[in-house]
Each structure stands twice: as structure tokens, then as C-alpha cells.
Amino acid sequence: MKTVILAGGLGTRISEETSTRPKPMVEIGGKPILWHIMKTYSAHGIHDFVICCGYKGYVIKEYFANYFLHMSDITFDMQNNKMEVHQRYAEPWKVTLVDTGDDTMTGGRLKRVADHVKDEEAFCLTYGDGVSDVNITDLVTFHKAQKVKATLTATIPPGRFGALDMNGNKVNSFREKPKGDGAMINGGFFVLSPQVIEYLADDKTVWEREPLERLAEEGDLAAFQHNGFWQPMDTLRDKMHLEELWQSGKAPWKVWS
């Protein structure tokens, strides 16, 4: 099974981090958030990835081009022009990197990688800027049982700010960031049939609009309800929050050992 990751956006709301690199390459705990997402899928046995590159996509390509060197113990024999690998720590991943254009919309990016997923029974799709502890194995099983063309992960978004417990004009205590108003949203982490490619017109197609709306109208869109951890990295505040969780040693999305 393959996972397609949308990694071509500009990341304008986190421009402090994205002036020199694409948003999926912003680091959490010294690793790109893209790496964290891939580790989540890999923990569930999915090791084949198609990355939809766009803005500064060469940074992603260079990262994986040098990944083997970064993740191995190596001796370089300069005199004899030899390289000896002592220990390899790299993951068992197959990574296909596709330039899908700087200005292409999400649906257009998926359409541009259609040849890489057209022969799959089903494939996963997600965004390259958010992490979760969603159980991918259960998600895929759910999708197959629903017998639909598309399944999204429905989740309750986290609140943006901490809440105050007050008594009149006095603050009694602080509470952790509450979740939103209780309404579930599209949290990404899709499982799709290759048939969804037929719903994508061109580079201007926004996956979250007409394609998903049509699938819903036709009864071909299911929702896998996830009540666990889910966090996008939309702002610098989000990035700092994820970094704090990682440094605490209790990052909820770290489902791998």
C-alpha cells in the first residue's frame, strides 16, 4: 500500500520557518515534520511513499538524497576513493518525489501523481503539516468495510488558547487548551480508491471542495471518527507546542518504538 503526502504548500502562516524551506521540512525534535508523518505510517506497515513537492521541493529531494549518509556510520577512505558503511539506521522506505508545481492546488497535486497510485486497490493520502496518533491500520480496515471510494478522518480540532476558570473578575485557575466547539472537521488521513482521480479536473482543483463534496453527495465518502490526538502545524505557536510535546518525551503521535 502507498501513502501520498501533500508537501507543496507555501506555509505563509508560519513564514518565520518557511522562508528557506517548505513547510513539511520544518523540524520537530531535529527531524522534519514530514519524517514524523512517515514514521506514523511506517509503524503500521506502510513504507511506500509518494511525496507531492512544490514550493522549494528541492529541499525535500536533497534531504532524501542524503538520508542514507545521514542515517549510517560511514568511513570515507579519501586516498583510495572508497566508502565503507558500518551500520545502517535508515528506515525501509521507498520514497518517490514528484514535482507537482508551485501553484497547484491540492486536488491538482493528487491528479499529477495519479500514475503512481492508479494500480493500487486503495491508497492513503494526507497533508505534510500535521501529526496524529490515528490508528492507520484500523482506518484502512474501516475504509474497506464501508465499500466507498473515499474515507476521511474526522476529528475535533484543538483549541488555540488556554482557558481561564473565573469567578467574577477573579481568575481561579488556568485550564489546558480546550477542544473546539465539539464539531468534527476533516482531519486528513484519507484512504482512497484510485477512482477518485476521476473527480479531479486540473491543477486548479481543490480536493477539499468539489471532489469531496461530490463524493459526499453520491454517498461515497465515509468518516473514520478519531477522538485521540490530532494537531496541525499552521502557526509558529503550533510548532512550539509540538516541540514542547516532543521534548517532554510524551509526544502522543510517536506510535513507533
Language-model region placement:
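Well-ordered alpha-helical segments embedded in enzymatic catalytic cores
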Residues: H36, R109-R112, P211
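Conserved beta-loop-beta/alpha segment of the NTase-like Rossmann-fold superfamily
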Residues: E62-G168
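N-terminal glycine-rich phosphate-binding loop and ensuing alpha1 helix
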Residues: M1-N66, L97
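Catalytic-core segments of class I nucleotidyltransferases/pyrophosphorylases
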Residues: E121-C124, V131-S132, I136-K144, T155-G159, ...
